[in-house]
Amino acid sequence: MRVGIGYDVHKLVDGRDLIIGGEKIPFEKGLLGHSDADVLCHAIGDSILGAAALGDIGRHFPDTDNRYKGYSSLKLLEEIKRIINEKGYYITNIDSTIIAQKPKMLAYINNMRKNISKVLDISIEDINIKATTEEELGFTGKQLGIKAQSICLLNKNI
């Protein structure tokens, strides 16, 4: 068994869709980034790669590569799954947290879990997503951006 952690943060800006966990969430701002800036998928991807000691998403999908401009982070997760499977690893479970003052995430979490379980080809019961605020403190509390954290447990085929 191997464990990895992931963390990501993106700034909220006007003129972009808000995509979290592959789900388009109605909100007046979206996250700024080279890809679709899906903060949750990025944290999950980093936790998976970290558990396999394979670096991070920046190494595999650099923001200097135009192939990933506007790229779906769900597709990044599909690629990450392929990468770890080639090394003999499979995902046991994922636990993650979205940190955002607004919008409220509860209504979207089940669809996020479905989206992520589908692209990673794991049971929805093996993915947990929580949401919290920072009680109007700091970067997320002042609604300047959104953060996500993730932990992943991998096993290796013998």
UniProtKB/Swiss-Prot annotation:
Keywords: Isoprene biosynthesis, Lyase, Metal-binding. Pathway: Isoprenoid biosynthesis; isopentenyl diphosphate biosynthesis via DXP pathway; isopentenyl diphosphate from 1-deoxy-D-xylulose 5-phosphate: step 4/6. GO terms for molecular function: 2-C-methyl-D-erythritol 2,4-cyclodiphosphate synthase activity; metal ion binding. GO terms for biological process: isopentenyl diphosphate biosynthetic process, methylerythritol 4-phosphate pathway; terpenoid biosynthetic process. Its EC number is 4.6.1.12. A divalent metal cation binds at residues 8, 10, 42. Binds 1 divalent metal cation per subunit. Belongs to the IspF family. This is 2-C-methyl-D-erythritol 2,4-cyclodiphosphate synthase. The lineage of its organism: Bacteria, Bacillati, Bacillota, Clostridia, Eubacteriales.
